[in-house]
Curated annotation (Swiss-Prot):
CDD domains: PRTases_typeI (cd06223). The lineage of its organism: Bacteria, Pseudomonadati, Pseudomonadota, Gammaproteobacteria, Aeromonadales. This is Xanthine-guanine phosphoribosyltransferase. It comes from the Bacteria. Its cofactor is Mg(2+). Its EC number is 2.4.2.-, 2.4.2.22. 5-phospho-alpha-D-ribose 1-diphosphate binds at residues 37-38, 69, 90-98. Guanine binds at residues 94, 137.
Amino acid sequence: MPKKFYVSWDNLQREARRLARRQLPVSQWKGIIAVSRGGLVPAALMARELGIRNVETLCISSYDHNNQRDLVVVKAATTAGDGEGWLVVEDLVDTGTTAKAIRELYPKAKFIAIFAKPMGEQLLDDFEVAIPQDTWIEQPWDMALEFATPICDEE
């Protein structure tokens, strides 16, 4: 079983804000391309921090929670053209398979992610947190808070 890295909502927002600060000035951006689904929340955070209201989606699928499978482009961000002036936002770049496809679709876009693993890191223009390749990231939207039984009541 791979190591796991758990991301809280607070941690995600803090890292997104740090990454957003490096994307200034805002005037250089026509909009954001949110990579669905993992990049939707980070893109919303970026849009808020940068004051960008033009948000497109690229619906691309290569994971079924824990399993990587064939890449499928469900919907492209057609108004973004070759990506010039656009900021592509993803939560994580892992092996680079999805990132390569995104680079082919939008070669002139700036491609950023909150988290990056070594195999995909070189495909990004910017990222905030380096994660070891053998570590699985659990994002806050995939988890739920639940009641923890007090130690004295565990028996």
